[in-house]
Amino acid sequence: HSVGEAAMGIQWHVLAMFGPSFFTGRLMDRFGKRRITALGLILIAASGALALMGLALTHFWGALVLLGLGWNFGFIGATALLTEAYRPSERAKVQALNDFLVFGTVAVASFGSGQLLHSVGWDGINLGMLPLVVVVLALLAWQGLRQRQQMTARG
């Protein structure tokens, strides 16, 4: 594929990452933070599945767009859930620490991404993220069930 085609895919990916931010908060208010976070994780899994289906430009672009949308819903939803777990006076510091850890990890990981691709391959990367998505979805479901049980116990 050409550099222009790759650049177009990255442009749509970045748009998918940040464009939905204008309405993600309203979606969380309407459907719940946990559901939107779960939707983000499902979209990330779908991006991996699409990437595994082939190496055509449409697979690449589609996977990047799904990954961007998944990141938006997953990251914003999870950040909202995280800050909800703390007192109002602590929330800004917790969010700042979370952002530092997340983006610091991304920066460090970007240095090893080429080596990871070389050692496990395209399919390995896309298959490797699926168990992580399943674990986080299971934790979200467990947290939601626990919260419902606590609310039921309170009456």
Which sequence ranges carry the predicted segments?
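Loop-to-transmembrane helix entry
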Residues: 1-16
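Helix-to-loop junctions at the C-terminal end of transmembrane segments
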Residues: 19-33, 117
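Structural signature of the two symmetry-related core transmembrane helices
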Residues: 35-50, 130
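Paired small-residue
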Residues: 58-66
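Intracellular juxtamembrane helix-capping segments at the cytosolic ends
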Residues: 73-87
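A late C-terminal transmembrane helix in Major Facilitator Superfamily
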Residues: 90-119
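A membrane-interface helix-boundary motif in multi-pass transporters
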Residues: 115-133
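Multi-pass alpha-helical transporter architecture, strongest
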Residues: 130-155
